[in-house]
Amino acid sequence: MKPFVIAIDGPAASGKGTLARKIAAHYHLHHLDTGLTYRGVAYALLQHNLALDDEKNAITYAKELDFNTLNLAFLSSHELGEAASKIALNPTIRKILVEKQRNFAKTLPGSVLDGRDIGTIVCPDADIKFYILANVQTRAKRRYQEILKKGGQANYHEILNDLEQRDSRDITRKESPLKPAENAHLLDTSELSIEATFAIACSFIDPIIKMHIIG
């Protein structure tokens, strides 16, 4: 049996990560937040006081990165996300990490991968694809509230500005720009709770995963 793969893409703070984790738990699949792989490389550079454009060391860290050590709570800071967005512009680093992400997707019984180029580049043959949308104001508010909930300090307008710049970088970069796969289901979560989004996603997944199991 080949692994069952679910691809979830979307801009920063759209809710794709939360959705991916719920789907993976519900269907007993492995989960990979591919954004954490770029954050992991960025963190390694910053820990060694190296510049984000230090390609030689970034390549080394990308090759050595152990996906099993990626910790969402540890790598989830807004600042690290900004750094990872810049790391992701490097085509050599993307190539290394994409290959490792594809190998992860081969794990049985299957995986849910979320990121920005899963359905288009990493797993173009995924069994089902989603593209999660939300307007930038809603995403900024979510990120702001998330930081406050964790006891951190944040400025809503700075977060909004950062997300707008990040969207621009992700959409316009030459390598793997952020865009929906042609056969992706588009879900706008601006006015939806995570429970409602999850229910809609499951309504698309259920018939396909049943066919996969039978087949």
From Swiss-Prot:
User: Which Gene3D superfamilies does the annotation name?
Assistant: P-loop containing nucleotide triphosphate hydrolases
Sorted alphabetically, which Pfam families does this protein's record hold? Cytidylate_kin (PF02224)
Q: Write down the chemical reaction(s) this protein catalyses.
A: CMP + ATP = CDP + ADP; dCMP + ATP = dCDP + ADP
Q: Which of UniProt's keywords are assigned here?
A: ATP-binding, Cytoplasm, Kinase, Nucleotide-binding, Transferase
Q: Which CDD domains match?
A: CMPK (cd02020)
Q: Which SUPFAM superfamilies match?
A: P-loop containing nucleoside triphosphate hydrolases (SSF52540)
* Keyword flag Nuclease: no
**Name of this protein:** Cytidylate kinase
Q: Highest lineage ranks of the organism?
A: Bacteria, Pseudomonadati, Pseudomonadota, Alphaproteobacteria, Hyphomicrobiales
